[in-house]
Amino acid sequence: MTYKIMAINAGSSSLKFQLLNMPQGALLCQGLIERIGLPEARFTLKTSAQKWQETLPIADHHEAVTLLLEALTGRGILSSLQEIDGVGHRVAHGGERFKDAALVCDDTLREIERLAELAPLHNPVNALGIRLFRQLLPAVPAVAVFDTAFHQTLAPEAWLYPLPWRYYAELGIRRYGFHGTSHHYVSSALAEKLGVPLSALRVVSCHLGNGCSVCAIKGGQSVNTSMGFTPQSGVMMGTRSGDLDPSILPWLVEKEGKSAQQLSQLLNNESGLLGVSGVSSDYRDVEQAADAGNERAALALSLFAERIRATIGSYIMQMGGLDALIFTGGIGENSARARAAICRNLHFLGLALDDEKNQRSATFIQADNALVKVAVINTNEELMIARDVMRLALPQARELAVSA
């Protein structure tokens, strides 16, 4: 038996979606509604055979969801909306409460909205997406899949910041970690490709895109991750600084009179590859500039790799060794240069790349005699979301859901 599951990612002015046939994971359609709220919004819908794109005014998310559901039947992808068996929603922040994906009920929704103080840019619109689909598809079960849930297995030594205790106890300031759905998916896919239980492996997963995070996975569980209280921390990213000396911030307040909002803008949108190179936040553009002799661009690439290498090294020490290193995300999946820079001079760990395999982004790119496996795995958060819907919302389908 097959089930049609929707995976939804609602952004502040966008709605990203996939419709999958489960448990096979076959993609029936995917698309994006962007520039919601503007007179020239754009709706893109793709199947394996066709692509439709339309520019039109879309006033709000309610109109966007209505348009999407009408298109599914209007374009013949579904004969009826009753064919939809479940909807999974990506939610940025689950706090300490959600240690797994959760079946949506009124209480779940209220908690997602309460956690908006920890993710003010994401949780409110994630909750809005859930409410709209519940309103328009009232008979269809919904599941919330949290970016933070996979990291709820961290020990206190990994998640607690050395601040006065009350900042954790009263304000919830601690490491939460993000990209959890991606790290969970690629580590599970790695174990499947190796034919080894994930519980038997020590893995470091590098999700490298415009946002970047590194995750240590031991015994099938996240034991450390580079992003912390917010997705701004950790390694260097496209426009985000990652970790830096916290005293820089009050110093900038005194020196330049910057407000909290200006500091947030600086750290989140003006730093990282863009800030150091002065060229772009896109790794490919910085590569091109470095190849043309731009010294700051070359420095940005080196700094990017070194921050990741330092994080990987600390995780290897924490886990007592390494069995596999995973690269995923836009940079991790596509940049042989980034992978080579990160894996440089690691022969002493039993980790070495095969240059030819790395250049063609083979699934496994380690040298033949290397002890540590190095894998390039395309992430698929939507498939992971659909699996969680199968597992939690469709009891009759649990045995069909691929274990994750």
Curated annotation (Swiss-Prot):
It is an enzyme of class 2 (transferase). Pfam families: Acetate_kinase (PF00871). One of its GO terms (biological process) is propionate catabolic process. It comes from Klebsiella pneumoniae subsp. pneumoniae (strain ATCC 700721 / MGH 78578). GO terms for cellular component: cytoplasm. GO terms for molecular function: acetate kinase activity; ATP binding; propionate kinase activity. Its EC number is 2.7.2.15. This is Propionate kinase. SUPFAM superfamilies: Actin-like ATPase domain (SSF53067). The keyword Transcription regulation does not apply. InterPro entries: Ac/propionate_kinase (IPR004372), Aliphatic_acid_kin_short-chain (IPR000890), Aliphatic_acid_kinase_CS (IPR023865), ATPase_NBD (IPR043129), Propionate_kinase_PduW (IPR024896). It catalyses: propanoate + ATP = propanoyl phosphate + ADP. Works with phosphate acetyltransferase (pta) to capture exogenous propionate and regenerate propionyl-CoA during degradation of 1,2-propanediol (1,2-PD). It is found in: Cytoplasm. Belongs to the acetokinase family. PduW subfamily. Keywords: ATP-binding, Cytoplasm, Kinase, Nucleotide-binding, Transferase.
